[in-house]
From Swiss-Prot:
Gene3D superfamilies: 1.10.10.2360, 1.25.40.690, Peptidase S59, nucleoporin. GO terms for biological process: mRNA transport; post-transcriptional tethering of RNA polymerase II gene DNA at nuclear periphery; protein import into nucleus; ribosomal subunit export from nucleus; RNA export from nucleus; telomere tethering at nuclear periphery. Transmembrane segments: none annotated. Its EC number is 3.4.21.-. PANTHER family: NUCLEAR PORE COMPLEX PROTEIN NUP98-NUP96 (PTHR23198:SF6), NUCLEOPORIN (PTHR23198). Residues 62-77, 588-600, 653-663, 1094-1104 have a biased composition (Low complexity). The lineage of its organism: Eukaryota, Fungi, Dikarya, Ascomycota, Taphrinomycotina. The gene is nup189. This is Nucleoporin nup189. Contains G-L-F-G repeats. Nup189 is autocatalytically cleaved in nup98 and nup96.
Length: 1807
């Protein structure tokens, strides 16, 4: 491939990039049987591509001369390029290395480009690219162990017999290096002494030269002169600090002002630049006689045949006296630009050609190949070699920059090449080869137009030409450097193709305009549209490897760079050239007035392009890029290079310095190369002021600038913005004027050029300096809310367009992109698991959750349907998006499915790191006692549409019913007034997706403003909302006006689609009246009644809701602060407006008459524009804009007082809802709370009761096993725990905080079975028992705090701080380990003695006192001091010393500040020797009372409503140590539970009061109905039991509710509540489980029958009711049922069977019924008479008739049913009495008048 015999690839054989060539030739070395030279060393017959172990490797083959080194097997002196020897390959063959292999000859003289190892022994085994290795390893100028004279690139040193190799840069070498080498005894250098440039330029070496002088400068602002009294202001010393200059003076021996050394550094002949004893580039060294200069100086006595980069002996191959490019000496080695070739058979070649300058050859060989007449195997140059078959007939051979070789020469300039040549054995007559750098061979169009093209210089337009000149008219130029032809568009991999058809001379002349190739060259292709010599901002299209070739003529030593946007590897030129460019060349680019931002290979992207050896740019504001060897800046403003001066000595000619002033880094975060080509505009000099001006005696008055002072941003060329900022101008609220009248750019980056000015008012001081208020441009959309904009459909949000302007055509900038980091987001089940699910299973995925590490998670409570997602991996990061403190599902507007579908289901959201922020430090506030922390928790409870669950450790957990965007913003938290926390008017912030609408008054927001969240039944129910903001600055007692109200016609609220103007138009946009807000009337400051609210528009009853949060119940209208919605980007504050008099509610009045006129004009125009007569209904339906109609106008002018309603989804977690004295529960799951007015609202609380208690059943089962059901003295069943009950199993069955509580309870109160010695006294046993309990408590506290302690320790910065934190957590062992690891032997010795002895503590205290006494305390580390304080037993305040303001003042440190209360209590327990739990608690309580502002109160973190609820752990400790009542322990919030979850506190109260009898409720009173020896009844105890039982029953666990109710102390309450509970839950009958539970609870059968009777009464089954009452032995109740319903119904219906069955249940039980005689007995006698049971006994029958007649008169018939039955029985008895002639009985019957008259007639007749 690279030199193989007839191989394919890059130039030989067949295959990849080259055509089949019959001639042998590879890319980097031809294969010839003659000793001809190749590019990288001659080729042997068996070499392969890259590094195979062959006899003749790639770059180390055994021919004579090559670019990268050759292997010399003979004694010839052919110079190689890289100094390689035989057996070496480029990429690491097993032989000698690539760039510095040894030569096997006895006296070789081949010099490598980077230095060669020449050795005549086998001791050297060179290694490639070593900078200064031992002998045998060559790099950049390494030594060899013998007298080899090869010169490295940077100079090599050959010391005979010395194996210590010097490094490459600046070391002494015996051969001539490119940048300077010295020989022994002759000294040569590369570019120094007597060559082209041999001068010594001054370098800063201290302050001697130039001497100090005062620097004066004219101030462009004031036309005055500023004087700078500083040496660093001098131009020569501006790049140095005082210390650097002082150090240089010291190094020169000038400690006292005496000037000495004046050594200077020149461009090509300076003192050592890299620190070597010899110069890197050829300094004149004393004592040298042979000085080889860069371009051919004389070396009279130089007989060393070592060659440098540019030739033997000297740089460019000459060895004569004072010649530029080579002399006629007999130098056998090859130079870079030409070799001195004699008629001898020395076949060594130069790097770029074989011939020398002084030979009589027809072709100039400076950059071409040799044309020897005597040798048919002469060496070839790098880029144009004579083929082995060349016999000298082709005299126009191609070199580096010119003619093509006449044969099948290899390399970069031959007629056959690797990268796209398409020739077959072209004749030798064509001279079509070109050079590497595209300088062009002279191509003749008259012959061989299809001549072969070469890889790196051929005449082709293929994709892989390295500088091809296309066929055109031959236009040779001098030296053959720049001959070009007209070329078509080159291929994609053109590495330097010339594009012009004009000649390109060698040394800087330009060419004329040429066609524009699209391709670019490796070393600089000309871009399209190149205009030579004019530099009229032509924009080339491509960039090359080494820099884009510009449109002007470019050549090696100077090219004119015009505006081409391409960037090169080593630098590029950019657009916006203001003047014609001079040529930039190899040794320096001269860019005139460019604004380039492209960087080079060796520099970061910067603003200018650096040349190889220097950079010359003009009129650059600031540049950071310089050439590799220094910058030569022409007329730059404060132009500096990266290396200070050039490597060759940078000369800065004609610089125009900027004023000396302080400056700020314009781009501290780097520069985006994407915008490096954009033009920038700098504000005029006249308006730029220095940030730090020189001191003057008095400020100079300035004239007013013609332009505004303030620009939006300095248009520096290195400033890149992704989006322009919208225009700002001072305008009225409803006025819409733009600052700039020019149209917006239509291209992606053109908008970056739009100059935007700020109003000067934006920078005027304000009272609140934290916030810059900019009057936002008010557009039509702002007024009419998403109306039609510019005649287009306003589907895109105007706010979004302002935040990120984009080209509507391509949409290249998306307004909201979320970068998904695969390692941040996670799903459960994972994507891998979900991908395995069938589609049916994806339709219902249970327990689905998505989260983002460090942000939060969302857990969906219902099964979700994931089958609708094309890519499941799009769910995290695109569908479910987590940002800081924000969670959004379906963030894209309109993508949300209806409620209940997809992911729009109820879920629990956890947001992390949601602490409140401090106003001063913006750090999170983690202290629960901080007022802002408490306010923050309150705010989280009040956020609408969220159900607060918990807030702990910065994690906010809440529940939502549907999805939108939920979260917090703390940008404006400093705006909150701490003194008005009770007057907060809500926390709801809403914004349309995906744009945030953030309030400037609060840090919380939430919205359900997502499609599908609340589906609308009609398209006309979306609201056009007007927002009010009360201006607190208005006077409170203003008689003639209400408060100023800021009106925000929000343009990004939801829009409605209005169709026909029918009755739906009456459902107008909701307007919040200032007179009635939040259900309060302003006149009387009382809540509005339901009658007031009944006049609301009907739209308010159909999912219509206000964006204004309901205020607190105590909030008066005068103090209301309705949150306005302001945009996140600029948080605009519109000009305030006022409402007029009371008769004009809602009338908008501006501050001045001009704005009022503008407002009127705009409103009039907008109303007319909104209702064009030709607009059809169809257009209205298709448009999403809201149109301003007459009704809206009337609403604006006169207001609407009856639009505010009570929203149906208002939750109970409102402020003032949970008022302990006015909040009552009912047994059926309802609650009643009374507000300040007489309004009483009943709401169901089922939704607020925790439905799931995963551990509750297990814990109750354990307690049931430990409970005994017994009969009390009254004979009623009751339950009580056994005295042997322990709570340790409860801790095992529970989790989280509850488990910690039960652990502590077990430690403190469970009976212990310690194995104590029996011989101890009872007192000693008690003391030992208490110590064991203390140790258990200590271990519990340590374990509880362990996670927190280790986390804090990891965050500690020093070992002392880490030790202190570990000690506060009682992690003594880890603290000792940390002290040992930090080698703090003193602490490692003291720490194990913690709490061991009082004497130890006293000694530590004495040490602290000694430090204070001797004033050593200021020098003691803070945490070391705190450690000693703990070891001394001090846990309160670490006392300081001195007085504030003194030098030795040390401030006192509160030890327990910012500590949790449990840690503070632990310090009392751990660091006080031999202290009990009670004593530790006493000390803690005393410290808490003494330092209330320092110590944290033991308050539960979930405490709300401003009520301090003590932590249950603290209460348990206090109950153990001091005793307490159970009232404090039985508040659910104290256990961090829901306010309606009583399980933990109920179980704890039952255990402590009944099982252990350790503490009890304080309200037990003696029941007068019980004996004196009975235990008094506690009402609080029964209330707690009823509350927990109600909770269980409401959650469906009514059987467990029965178990709880058995613990009621009051007998009647116990019986009634149990039967009631049974009755409510017998609807479906009793299952097997219920029966078993009832039996286990020993529920009496009578209670169960009573419950069944109650249920039968409920369903109207009176017969079963009577039956179960009789079964329950409740005969009184059964008799009542009989009289009221059952018996009358049976009599009326004649159902004797039913009546008989009902009466049978009373057999034998009538004696105890007082009312039976005149009740049930009547129906019994009636049944007997009806059935004729007394017919056999006439006497009994008559007795019964007389008895029933009397009883019927006494029967109390109250209802119609009873009266009807009585009438029927009376008539029946009357008939029997008439039959028996019982006149006395007839007179007693309660008969109607007609019956009574008939009886009277019969009696009269009988009488």
């Amino acid at each position: 491939m690279f030199g193989q015999n007839n191989s394919s690839g890059f130039g030989g054989g067949t295959g990849a990039f080259g055509q089949n060539n019959q001639q042998t030739g590879g890319l980097f070395g031809s294969n010839s049987n003659t000793p001809g030279n190749t590019l990288f060393g001659s080729q042997n017959t068996s070499t392969t591509g890259f590094g195979q172990n062959t006899t003749q490797p790639l770059f180390g083959s055994n021919t004579n001369g090559g670019l990268f080194g050759n292997r010399n097997n003979t004694t010839t002196t052919g110079g190689t390029g890289f100094g390689m020897s035989s057996g070496t390959g480029m990429f690491g063959q097993s032989n000698t290395p690539a760039f510095g292999g040894t030569n096997n000859a006895t006296n070789p003289s081949g010099g490598g480009l980077f230095g060669s190892n020449t050795a005549n022994n086998n001791a050297n085994t060179g290694t490639s690219f070593s900078f200064g290795s031992n002998a045998g390893s060559t790099g950049f100028g390494n030594t060899a162990s013998n007298t080899g004279t090869g010169g490295g690139l940077f100079g090599s040193q050959n010391n005979a017999g010395n194996t210590a190799g010097n490094t490459g840069f600046g070391s002494q070498g015996t051969g001539g290096g490119l940048f300077g080498s010295s020989t022994t005894p002759a000294t040569t250098n590369a570019f120094g002494t007597s060559g082209f440039v041999s001068s010594n330029a001054n370098a800063v070496n201290g302050t001697a030269n130039p001497p100090y002088a005062v620097t004066s400068e004219k101030d462009p602002q004031t036309n005055g002169t500023s004087v700078f009294q500083s040496i660093t202001c001098m131009p020569a010393y501006r790049s140095y600090s005082f210390e650097e200059l002082r150090l240089q003076d010291y190094n020169q021996g000038r400690r006292f002002g005496n000037a000495s050394s004046t050594n200077t550094t020149s461009a090509f002949g300076s003192t050592p630049a890299f620190g070597a004893s010899t110069t890197p580039f050829g300094q004149n060294l004393s004592g040298t006689t042979n000085n080889a200069t860069p371009f051919g100086t004389s070396n009279a006595t130089n007989t060393t045949p070592g060659s440098g980069l540019f030739g033997g002996g000297s740089a460019f191959g000459s060895n004569t006296t004072n010649t530029g490019f080579g002399s006629g000496t007999n130098n056998a080695s090859g130079g870079l630009f030409g070799q001195n070739n004699n008629t001898t058979s020395t076949p060594s070649t130069g790097l770029f050609g074989g011939s020398t300058f002084n030979q009589q050859k027809p072709a100039f060989s400076g950059f071409g190949s040799t044309t020897n007449t005597t040798n048919t195997g002469t060496g070839t140059g790098l880029f144009g070699s004579n083929n082995a078959t060349n016999t000298g007939t082709g005299q126009t051979t191609g070199g580096l920059f010119g003619g093509a070789a006449t044969g099948t020469g290899t390399g970069f300039g031959s007629s056959t090449g690797g990268f796209g040549s398409n020739t077959n054995n072209q004749p030798n007559s064509g001279t079509m080869g070109t050079g590497l750098f595209g300088f062009g061979a002279n191509n003749n169009t008259a012959n061989n137009n299809t001549a072969p093209t070469s890889t790196f210089g051929g005449n082709n337009s293929s994709n892989f030409s390295f500088g091809a000149n296309n066929n055109a008219a031959t236009k040779p130029s001098g030296f053959g450097f720049g001959s070009t032809t007209t070329t078509p568009a080159s291929g994609g991999f053109s590495f330097g193709q010339n594009a012009n058809n004009a000649p390109k001379p060698a040394f800087g002349s330009t060419a004329t305009t040429a066609p524009k190739p699209a391709g670019t060259g490796l070393f600089g292709g000309l871009g399209a549209g190149a205009n030579t010599n004019t530099a009229t901002n032509a924009t080339g299209t491509g960039g090359s490897l080494f820099g884009n070739a510009n449109t002007a003529g470019s050549n090696m030593f100077g090219s004119a760079n015009s505006s081409t946007p391409g960037t090169g590897l080593f630098g590029s030129t950019q657009t916006n050239n203001a003047t014609s460019n001079t040529g930039t060349g190899l040794f320096g680019s001269n860019n005139a007035n460019t604004t380039n931002t492209g960087g080079s290979l060796f520099n970061k992207p910067s603003t200018t392009t650096g040349g190889l050896f220097g950079n010359t740019t003009a009129q650059q504001p600031s540049t950071t890029t310089s050439g590799l060897f220094g910058a030569s800046n022409t007329n730059n403003q404060a132009q500096t290079s990266n290396f200070g001066t050039g490597l060759f000595g940078g000369s800065q000619a004609g610089q125009q310095q900027q004023p000396l002033q302080a400056s700020i880094d314009q781009n501290p975060y780097g520069n985006n190369p994407l915008f490096s080509s954009t033009t920038s505009q700098v504000a005029p000099t006249s308006i730029q002021e220095p940030i730090a001006s020189p001191l003057t005696s008095k400020p100079t008055p300035k004239k007013a600038a013609s332009l505004p002072q303030f620009w939006l941003s300095p248009r520096s060329h290195n400033t890149a913005r992704l989006a322009s900022i919208s225009s700002f101008a001072k305008s009225a609220v409803m006025n819409s004027t733009s600052a700039s009248g020019k149209p917006k750019s239509l291209h992606l980056f053109d908008s970056l050029n739009d100059d935007v000015l700020l109003s000067a008012d934006a920078f005027t001081p304000r009272q609140n300096i934290k916030k810059l208020v900019i009057t936002h441009k008010i557009s039509k959309d702002d007024i009419l809310q998403n109306g039609v904009k510019n005649g287009n459909d306003a589907k895109s949000d105007s706010k979004v367009q302002e935040k990120a302007p984009q080209n509507e055509a391509d949409g290249s900038l998306k307004k909201d992109e979320h970068v998904v980091l695969s390692d941040d987001y996670w799903m459960k089940p994972s994507i891998e698991e979900l991908s395995k699910y069938p589609k049916e299973k994806l339709c219902s995925v249970h327990q689905f959750s998505v989260g983002r590490t460090g942000y939060g998670q969302v857990a969906f409570l219902k099964p979700v349907d994931l089958s609708g997602f094309e890519k499941l991996e799009d769910i995290p990061g695109k569908v479910v998006v987590f940002e800081r403190k924000i969670c959004a599902v379906y963030p894209v507007e309109g993508s949300s499915p209806p409620l209940g579908e997809g992911l729009n289901v109820p879920a629990i959201i956890t947001l992390e790191k949601t602490w409140p922020l401090s106003r001063e430090t913006r750090e999170p506030i983690k202290d629960p006692q901080n007022p802002r922390y408490i306010q923050h928790v309150k705010r989280l409870h009040r956020i609408k549409d969220t159900e607060f669950i918990d807030f702990n450790d910065g994690k906010w957990i809440f529940k939502v019913q549907h999805f939108s965007r939920y979260g917090l913003l703390d940008d404006e938290e400093e705006e909150n007034d701490m003194s008005s926390t009770s007057n907060e008017a809500g926390n709801l912030k809403k914004y349309d997706q995906p744009n945030l609408k953030v309030s400037g008054k609060n840090d919380s927001f939430v919205t359900h403003h997502t499609p599908g969240a609340f589906p609308n039944d009609s398209k006309n129910k979306e609201l056009n909302r007007h927002f009010l903001k009360v201006d607190d600055s208005a006077p409170l007692d203003d008689t003639f006006m209400s408060k100023k109200v800021k009106l925000d016609f929000s343009s990004d609220s939801n829009v409605s689609e209005r169709g026909d103007y029918d009755d739906n138009a009456k459902k107008v946009d909701e307007v919040i009246s200032i007179e009635k807000v939040d259900g309060y009337s302003k006149e009387n400051n009382v809540p509005l009644s339901e009658d007031d609210l009944s006049n609301s528009s009907e739209s308010s009853n159909e999912s219509v809701y206000s964006l204004v949060e309901e205020s607190d119940a105590s909030l008066a209208a005068d103090n209301m602060d309705i949150e306005d919605i302001s945009e996140e980007s600029d948080r605009e504050e519109l000009s305030s407006m006022r409402f007029g008099a009371q008769d004009f509610h809602g009338l908008v009045v501006t501050d001045n008459w001009r704005d009022q006129l503008n407002l009127s004009v705009q409103r009039s125009a907008l109303i007319k524009a909104a209702f064009p007569e030709s607009q059809s209904n169809a257009n209205l339906k298709n448009s999403r804009g809201i149109y301003y109609n007459e009704h809206d106008l009337v609403t604006d002018i006169f207001g609407n007082q009856n639009l505010d309603t009570d929203r149906p989804w208002q939750s109970l977690d409102k402020p003032g809802a949970f008022i302990p004295s006015k909040f009552h529960f009912t047994a059926n799951g309802s609650c009643i709370y009374v507000l300040k007015s007489s309004d009483v609202k009943i709401r169901s609380i089922y939704d607020f009761i925790p439905t799931k208690d995963p551990n509750g059943t297990k814990l109750l089962e354990y307690q049931l096993d430990q409970t005994e059901v017994y009969l009390d003295l009254s004979g009623t069943h009751a339950a009580s725990p056994r005295s042997s009950m322990t709570v340790k199993p409860l801790s095992l069955c529970s989790s989280g905080y509850e488990s910690i509580v039960w652990d502590l309870t077990s430690i403190l109160f469970d009976p212990k079975n310690y194995s104590l010695p029996s011989e101890l006294s009872s007192e000693a046993r008690e003391v030992l028992y208490q110590k064991l309990v203390r140790e258990s408590l200590s271990e519990w506290i340590t374990k509880t705090l362990e996670h927190e302690t280790t986390t804090l320790a990891k965050e500690a910065e020093t070992s002392e701080e880490r030790i202190y934190i570990l000690l506060t957590g009682n992690l003594i062992g880890q603290a000792c380990e940390e002290a040992v690891q930090s080698q703090n032997n003193r602490l490692s010795t003291l720490i194990p003695l913690v709490n061991s002895d009082v004497d130890i503590q006293q000694e530590v205290k004495q040490q602290l006192e000694e430090w204070r006494k001797h004033g050593d305390l200021p020098f003691i580390n803070k945490f070391t001091r705190l450690i000693f304080e703990l070891l001394s037993g001090n846990t309160d305040i670490a006392e300081g010393c001195g007085t504030k303001g003194d030098e030795d003042y040390v401030q006192s440190i509160p030890i327990t500040k910012n500590m949790t209360w449990l840690r503070a209590f632990g310090l009392k327990l751990w660091y006080n020797t031999d202290i009990s739990i009670g004593e530790a608690m006493q000390l803690y309580v005393e410290s808490l009372q003494k330092f209330p502002e320092i110590m944290q109160k033991p308050i539960a973190t979930s405490a709300v409503q401003g009520i301090e609820v003590y932590d249950i752990i603290y209460l348990l400790l206090k109950a153990y140590a001091m005793g307490t009542s159970l009232e404090e322990l039985t508040i659910p919030e104290s256990a961090k539970c829901s306010p309606l979850n009583y399980r933990v506190v109920w179980q704890l109260a039952i255990y402590l009061s009944k099982a252990r009898s350790l503490c009890d409720f304080s309200d037990r009173v003696v029941d007068i109905n019980m004996a004196e020896d009975l235990k008094p009844i506690s009402v609080h105890s029964d209330q707690l039991t009823l509350a927990y039982a109600s909770q269980l029953e409401a959650s469906g666990q009514w059987l467990w509710s029965l178990f709880v109710l058995l613990h009621l102390e009051n007998v009647e309450t116990r019986t009634s509540t149990i039967t009631s509970c049974l009755a409510r839950n017998l609807r479906g009958g009793l299952g097997a489980g219920a029966v078993e539970m009832i039996e286990k609870l020993c529920i009496p059968e009578s209670w169960l029958n009573e419950a069944k009777a109650l249920y039968a009464r409920y369903v109207g089954d009176h017969l079963n009711e009577l039956y179960f009452l009789q079964e329950a032995a409740l005969y009184e109740d059964a008799h009542k049922v009989l009289l009221d319903t059952l018996a009358p119904q049976a009599v009326i219906s004649g159902n004797k069977t039913q009546l008989k069955k009902a009466l049978e249940g009373f057999n034998g039980q009538t004696d105890g019924l007082a009312s039976w005689r005149f009740g049930g007995q009547i129906y019994s006698d009636y049944l007997d008479l009806l059935e004729g049971n007394f017919d056999a006994n006439q006497e009994l029958k008559l007795f019964t008739l007389r008895k029933i007649s009397v009883a019927l008169k006494e029967l109390n018939a109250t209802n119609l049913l009873q009266k009807a039955a009585l009438h029927k029985i009376s008539r029946f008895v009357n008939a029997l009495c008439n039959e028996e002639s019982l006149t006395d009985a007839i007179c007693n019957l309660p008969l109607p008048l007609a019956d009574s008259l008939a009886n009277l007639q019969n009696i009269s007749v009988q009488f």
